[in-house]
Amino acid sequence: EYGQFGGEPYGALVGDYHFDHSPPDVELLGEMSKVAAASHAPFITGANPTLFQMDSWSELANPRDLTKIFQTPEYASWRSLRESEDSRYLGLAMPRFLGRYPYGDKTDPVEEFAFEEDTEGADSGKYCWVNAAYGMARNITRSFKEYGWCTRIRGVESGGTVDNLPTHNFPTDDGGVDMKCPTEIAISDRREAELAKNGMMPLIHRKNSDMAAFIGAQSLQKPAEYDDPDATANANLAARLPYLFATCRFAHYLKCIVRDKVGSFKERQDMQDWLQNWINNYVDFNADTSPEEVKARQPLAAAEVQVEEVEGNPGYYSSKFFLRPHYQLEGLSVSLRLVSKLPSQKAG
């Protein structure tokens, strides 16, 4: 569709798979990243707990440091994949979330016959789990439907929630009632930051509720570090999916626009002015005061277009687009200073 005249490009690719660091999976992810990069459509899929040397996500709280797991020799090909240029088009979501209530008279009755689905015991495999990639896909499509852009896909207040999850209550051994975590395991803030640092997109359950959220939307790519702080900052932005989705959408439009202009009598300056005026429609020039809804529809804080002639090839031009998106809050360091007045000893 992307390379077809009149075609409608795909915005994203979603795969119902779970990948780990095995050689076949790394090779397949590498090839999929090339397809996603060529079509400017990020590939969203799931991560397998075996990627972290675990049998299930319920063991996620056990390792003290997740980063050390990826420093062993068996992860050499995985590290190479994360350092590749096209890996920014890969997104691995985890853990799984509950797809439905267990069948039963009090949870989800079956009209045709009496059936009680057995979910007793500690075996979480008795439940119906869904790939977390579908949760991210839901946020992507919702953002596109409401704003025309796939930028509001993360955070509790900015489109990252997955609502109305099944909340199955079960009796405990001590006679109480507990709720099955709808995301396999509750993930702490510290562990969420570790997972994001290692290229994962964790789905975090809000305790005692039927809601979970993607706090971050980090791609699989490991951002490169440079001596120049600005270059390092650009690498960090390029590895985050909200900014990548905005850039990909511009790439889709540009190919169609330039294709329609082939054969028209345009000088270099005319083409540059026309493209600059077009892209200014998506720049929020009042970013300091505009609400979040305006930023979602106009995802750029600044944009500049440069068109240059190709030497030795009349009628051909090369263009450069400099895009600066609205920055999203990634974290906040808090310092506290406590002041206490102590009673002084009175002179006798």
For every predicted segment, state its role.
Residues 2-182:
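Extended, regular secondary-structure scaffolds
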Residues 44-46, 214-217, 308, 322-324:
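Generic beta-strand/beta-sheet core signal
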Residues 115-270, 274, 334:
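Long, contiguous, structured domain-core segments that constitute the functional module of a protein
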Residues 42-45, 49, 263-267, 280-288, ...:
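Intrinsically disordered or highly flexible coil/loop and linker segments, enriched in small
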Residues 270-290, 294-296:
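Short, hydrophobic/π-rich interface segment
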Residues 36-40, 218, 222, 231-235, ...:
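C-terminal accessory domains/tails appended to large, multi-domain proteins
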Residues 288-314:
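Short, structured protein-protein interaction patches enriched in aromatics and acidic/basic residues
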Residues 304-348:
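C-terminal edge-of-domain segments
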